[in-house]
Amino acid sequence: MKYFIKKFFNSLGFEIKRLNPQPQIGSDKRPVGQMDLLLEDLKFRGLKCQLIMDVGANRTYWSRMTKRIFPTANFCLIEPQIEMQNDLEIFCKEFPNSIFFLAGAGEKEDTLTLTIWDDLAGSSLLPLPNNKLENEGKQRKINILKIDNLISSGKIKMPNLIKIDVQGFELEVLKGATKTFGDTEVFILETSLFSFDDIPGVPSIADVINFMLERNYVIYDFPGFLRRPLDGALAQCDICFVKQNGFLRRSHKWK
């Protein structure tokens, strides 16, 4: 009977497979490339978060997912696009001890030009100012804050985990967050495998890895991958960095 049922559904273009349960949290069977699974595993291995910082918070999707995994953590959201203000306000109203800043982040406090993409997800600070784009509403001036100043002024506590997804501006954000190195346990950074023509100046994946290694942070996991539409080549990946001598790397055993 099973054979005939499978044949019937195959003839309709469907394939029947047995659903495999998700491997146990923290096991070596967990798939690579899934952000939520990495966060669950970090928590399982002992990561405790009082404050999580989301730089490039966009519509708060990542923060909402992370809040489900670390329900007692407070959040600091940094996002420069006015279109996201309502989402940021809703998040902070729903989770009252969280805070948001409607600004970008960089090496110093400043005013810079943000180039807006149609999907509002790929907006970047890297392209140079262009009068034509500004007149078309595709560029605008935004305020830039420095994360070190947020910490030293007491506006936020030291984050335990920082995620940065800012379309090639990650290293500039980190240059303004020097106080976090050595204290923040985990960084999750978007990196690129190409120097894209449409966003000039994107740091290479090697640049990001070396920058973090110089500050005693090493690769721990890869929670996300993205192929480019042009030809399907792997173009971006999220890298989880942890302290080189931190508790997450306490053991160097294989088994």
Where are the model-predicted features located?
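Phosphate/nucleotide-binding beta-alpha loop and adjacent structural elements of enzyme active sites
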Residues: M1-K255
